Amino acid sequence: MLSSKNIDDDFITLDSPRFLSHSDYIAENKRTTVSEGDLLMTIVGTIGRVAIVPKELKGICLQRSVAVIKPNKEIINNRYLMYQLQNMRSFLEKEARGVAQKGIYLKQVSQLDIKLPEIEQQKQIVKVLDKVSKLISLRKQQLAKLDELVKARFVEMFGTFPANPFRWSIGKIQDVVSDVRYGSSRPAVEGGKYPYLRMNNITYSGELDLRDTKQIDIPDSELDKCTVRRGDVLFNRTNSKELVGKTCVYNRDELMVLAGFVIRVRINERIRPEVLSAFLNMDFSKRMLIGMCKTAIGQANINAKELQNIDLYIPPIELQDQFVTLKNKIDQQKQTVQQSLEKLELLKKALMQEYFG
């Protein structure tokens, strides 16, 4: 059984599915049969992601966080409908209702107004959008390969942990830090004085993403405790279990206030921030973090004391500097690819606005 977490735009993953007994599967399949060419749309939590069921995906059923849409192929192309629904995401998010987790109803989906040109015109629109989407996908693959290159070079230079094949000095994170603090627990304020850096601004792969930031007002007396500066390591302490421990380096000079679900780590001369961040983002560390976090009310947590108690190796600083130089070069390549990706995404957005309004 798949959930909304398995549905991305034009892509379905089989990560962490829920398995059912044969009798439960029969009952669920009777309620909603999923067929090739159907559209799957997320309607709870992250709303409006839409993908098409491929031919090779058989025998699945869905949680109620996903709507199944069966297009009439005689009057509408399923990929045309997919793009049009994706273009409605902002509208659907505004229409969502709920307290703990917002969602939209199937009736709301069925009553959406859509543009319905002749089928041949739909195919032409799909052809254009597919071409741009393919280029976007290629850019994302390039970024993923560059991320994997950083990880591969990290292991090549330092080895895995706790295996520690090069027999580096072993310590704890508390041995390589000078200051560890939580961010502010104050709520975001529209039009606030300072930009507010939250857990969503740290990506799973360890990047700082400031495309969606909030603002906050905070007394001057509290600024030193919860603002970030260049070289700070930022650790996401509270999130879903698989996302706890997202870590990045703050590499800007802009004054920003840090939110409470993120820990600010200032390091000493024994380790470079890029090395500590890369260490915590390695697959072997992510497995360790999942194993040590505590879960309550749907959220997992690793506190500052637990973070500082994590074991790590401490390679020679000269070797760390070599890694930082290498990573900086790869980051420059990533920046070029990222800029191209953003231009393509803007183009796709403009085209969808032109086609669908």
Regions found by a protein language model. Give the residues of each.
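Sequence-specific dsDNA recognition surfaces
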Residues: 6-36, 171-186, 200-232
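A short glycine-rich beta-alpha junction/loop motif
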Residues: 43, 59-67, 85, 98-120, ...
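A short beta-sheet element
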Residues: 3-4, 23-86, 223-281, 303-304
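Non-catalytic DNA-recognition/assembly elements of restriction-modification systems
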Residues: 111-127, 141-182, 309, 314-321, ...
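Contiguous mid-protein beta-loop-alpha structural module that forms a pocket-lining wall or clamp
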Residues: 135-138
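Short amphipathic alpha-helical signal-transduction/dimerization elements
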Residues: 85, 89, 93, 281-284, ...
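A generic structural signal for short beta-strands and their flanking turns/coil linkers
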Residues: 16, 63-65, 193, 212, ...
